[in-house]
Amino acid sequence: MYAVLTAIIAYLIGCINNAYILTKYTRKIDIRNYGSGNAGATNVLRVLGYKAAAPVFALDVLKGVIAVLIGKYLMGNTGAMIAGIAVVCGHNWPVFLKFRGGKGIATSVGVVMTVSPLLGLIALAIGVTVIVLTKYVSLGSITGSVTFVLLNAIFWNSTQIFIFSLILASLAIFQHRSNIKRLLAGTESKLGQKTEIK
């Protein structure tokens, strides 16, 4: 019963799409109609720039943190992991936006930094390094997600947290499947390439 309640609460928190809300009420646009069509911080960055993207990223991280803390309060570490997966699913497929959301990376950052701070920080650092070196946000996001899985395999804690990391990485890779195709084709947009709003 608590597992279901935890998942529902976390999913609904994830459904609060900050990219959509902030751009809708500050710029009067639906961010999903611009750039990549993704309702997330990276697309806000691409379309509107750093000043618009920063609060979106921060709030997306925050909702991951809040969901995990609620899950931990209700069910301990198991609840934290259930909530972590559910909040990312809510961000990716929000019921209030006809299941058209973001890719879950900023929210995943909040999740892993709360569930496993040390390994999460290492994975984040590696992901950010890849972004800085290549200018590909998608590549850095995927690398960071996979790194978190590898770190959990190397510094084994429990089967539960390894499966948790595997599910999060699978969600990230699935949401970036079109980016992966563009990376392989050499047509992926780099950080700094901006789509102007008319």
UniProtKB/Swiss-Prot annotation:
<comment type="subunit">
    <text>Probably interacts with PlsX.</text>
</comment>
<keyword id="KW-1003">Cell membrane</keyword>
<comment type="pathway">
    <text>Lipid metabolism; phospholipid metabolism.</text>
</comment>
<feature type="transmembrane region" description="Helical">
    <location>
        <begin position="2"/>
        <end position="22"/>
    </location>
</feature>
<feature type="transmembrane region" description="Helical">
    <location>
        <begin position="154"/>
        <end position="174"/>
    </location>
</feature>
<feature type="transmembrane region" description="Helical">
    <location>
        <begin position="75"/>
        <end position="97"/>
    </location>
</feature>
<dbReference type="Pfam" id="PF02660">
    <property type="entry name" value="G3P_acyltransf"/>
</dbReference>
<dbReference type="GO" id="GO:0005886">
    <property type="term" value="C:plasma membrane"/>
</dbReference>
<keyword id="KW-0812">Transmembrane</keyword>
<comment type="function">
    <text>Catalyzes the transfer of an acyl group from acyl-phosphate (acyl-PO(4)) to glycerol-3-phosphate (G3P) to form lysophosphatidic acid (LPA). This enzyme utilizes acyl-phosphate as fatty acyl donor, but not acyl-CoA or acyl-ACP.</text>
</comment>
<keyword id="KW-0472">Membrane</keyword>
<dbReference type="GO" id="GO:0043772">
    <property type="term" value="F:acyl-phosphate glycerol-3-phosphate acyltransferase activity"/>
</dbReference>
<feature type="transmembrane region" description="Helical">
    <location>
        <begin position="48"/>
        <end position="70"/>
    </location>
</feature>
<feature type="transmembrane region" description="Helical">
    <location>
        <begin position="111"/>
        <end position="131"/>
    </location>
</feature>
<keyword id="KW-0443">Lipid metabolism</keyword>
<keyword id="KW-1133">Transmembrane helix</keyword>
<protein>
    <recommendedName>
        <fullName>Glycerol-3-phosphate acyltransferase</fullName>
        <ecNumber>2.3.1.275</ecNumber>
    </recommendedName>
</protein>
<keyword id="KW-0594">Phospholipid biosynthesis</keyword>
<keyword id="KW-1208">Phospholipid metabolism</keyword>
<comment type="similarity">
    <text>Belongs to the PlsY family.</text>
</comment>
<dbReference type="GO" id="GO:0008654">
    <property type="term" value="P:phospholipid biosynthetic process"/>
</dbReference>
<dbReference type="InterPro" id="IPR003811">
    <property type="entry name" value="G3P_acylTferase_PlsY"/>
</dbReference>
<keyword id="KW-0808">Transferase</keyword>
<keyword id="KW-0444">Lipid biosynthesis</keyword>
